[in-house]
C-alpha cells in the first residue's frame, strides 16, 4: 500500500500571509509594549527608592535636629512646636550653613591657653565633687562655679554642675538649662539626655505657672480705673523710666533726672553730647507713635517697624532711620544675615508676627520671641535693640500688659541671655523678660495700693536707693528691698 498523501493545507488568509512574509516587523511591534512596561516598572522602582532614601534621610536629619542646638527646630524650646523660631522652609534654607557650623565646631582645636583652662576646670570639678560627697556644699558650690567660669561650654562641667544644682540646691530650672547646653555641645551624651528627660516636664510646668501668675497680676492692674490718680502718676513715671533705661542699655550716660528734664523742658543738658540728647528725643517720638497708632493696629507690618525705627533714629541719623542696612555688621560673636537677605527674612518675620499660630502663645512668650527674632535679624545699621524692645512692648500692651522696663543695670544679663538664645536655648531670655514683666507689674500695683508711701519706680544709684528706703514707713520693708535690689544688683534674680 502506498502512503496516503497528506491533504494540502488550506491557503493562509491574507493577514497571516502578510505576517509570515514580514515576521521581523511583527516581532518588533510586539516588543514595544514589553519595553514600555519595563520602563514604567523601572521608573516606579526608582521613585520608590528615592522616596525611601528621602524618608530615611529626613528621619535621620530630624534626629540630628532634635539633638543639635544649631538648628532651631521644635526642640529649640522645651520641644514645643509653638516656640520654634523658624519654619520648615527656613530650616531647609539654612541647613547647609548650620551643618557647616556643626562640623567646624566639632573639628575645632583648642589653643594652649584654652586647653590649660579646661584642664584647670576639670581639676576644680573633681575637687567640687569630692567636697559635695563629704557634705561641704558651700565649698563645692564655689568650686563648681569656678569650673564653669573656666570652661563654660564643657559638657562634663555643665552636666555635673547641673546635677549639683538639681539635687543639692533645688534649682531645677538652671540645672535643666545646663543639661540642655551639654546636649547641644555633645548630642550623644546619654547622661545629659536622661537628665533632661527627667527635668523638662517639671521645668515646663514651672514656667507655665509663672505665666499664670503674671496673668493674675495683669488682671489686677487692669481692674484699676484709668482715672485713678496714682495710676496716672505711675504711668508718667514709667514713661520716663522706660526711655532712660532703654537708651542707657545702649550706653547713654544721661541720668534719670536729666532724661526727665529733656523730655519736659526740651532744654539741653550741659556736658552731654548731641547724640545722647537725640537718642532720648527719638525714643520719645517712637513711644508716642506706639501709643497713638501702633498699639491699636490688628496687624503689625514691615512698614510699621520701619516707621518705628525712623522715629527712633530720626534725630540721631535721619538718613538711616527707617531704612534697612546696606552693609554687613558684626555684633560680638553673632554675625547677622547679609543685607541681601534682609528683605526675605523680614517678610518671613512679618508673616510669623501676624500668623494664626501666635494665638497659641502666651503674650509674654510671644513678645519675647518677637524681640529676639528681630534683634537676631538685625535689619538696621543702628537702633536694633531699641526698636526690638519697643516692638516687644507694643505686643505686651496689646495684651493688656504695661510696657516692660528692662533696667540698664541688667545690661550684662540681658546680653548674656540673648547670647544663650543664639547658642540654642531661648528659654533663659524668655524667663528674663518674664522677670522684668513681673517687676514692672509689682511696681504699678504698689504705686496704686493703699500704702502710705508709694514705692519708687526705679532707683539710679545705691545712695539714692538708701535715701528712699530710709524715708519709707511701710512695715513690709523686705519686699520693698527685694524690688529695689532687682534694679540695682545686676543679678535679675527673683526674691
Swiss-Prot record:
Pfam family, one: Fic
Known role: Protein that can both mediate the addition of adenosine 5'-monophosphate (AMP) to specific residues of target proteins (AMPylation), and the removal of the same modification from target proteins (de-AMPylation), depending on the context. The side chain of Glu-250 determines which of the two opposing activities (AMPylase or de-AMPylase) will take place. Acts as a key regulator of the unfolded protein response (UPR) by mediating AMPylation or de-AMPylation of Hsc70-3/BiP.
One term under GO cellular component: plasma membrane
Annotated site (Important for autoinhibition of adenylyltransferase activity): 250
Family annotation (SUPFAM superfamilies): Fic-like, TPR-like
UniProt-listed GO biological process terms: detection of light stimulus involved in visual perception; histamine transport; protein adenylylation; response to endoplasmic reticulum stress; visual behavior
Family affiliation: Belongs to the fic family.
TPR repeat residue intervals: 121-154, 155-189
Record domain Fido: where: 300-435
Membrane topology, as annotated: Single-pass membrane protein
Assembly behavior: Homodimer.
Gene Ontology MF term list: AMPylase activity; ATP binding; Hsp70 protein binding; protein adenylylhydrolase activity; protein homodimerization activity
Location(s) in or outside the cell: Membrane
Superkingdom assignment: Eukaryota
Transmembrane segments: 36-58
Region (Disordered): 1-23
Locus of motif Inhibitory (S/T)XXXE(G/N) motif: 246-251
EC number, UniProt record: 2.7.7.108, 3.1.4.-
Binding site for ATP: 250, 331-334, 382-389, 414-415, 422
Main location: membrane
Regulation: The side chain of Glu-250 determines which of the two opposing activities (AMPylase or de-AMPylase) will take place. In response to endoplasmic reticulum stress, mediates de-AMPylase activity. Adenylyltransferase activity is inhibited by the inhibitory helix present at the N-terminus: Glu-250 binds ATP and competes with ATP-binding at Arg-389, thereby preventing adenylyltransferase activity. In unstressed cells, disengagement of Glu-250 promotes adenylyltransferase activity.
Residues at the catalytic site: 378
Keywords: ATP-binding, Hydrolase, Membrane, Nucleotide-binding, Nucleotidyltransferase, Repeat, TPR repeat, Transferase, Transmembrane, Transmembrane helix
Record-given protein name: Protein adenylyltransferase Fic
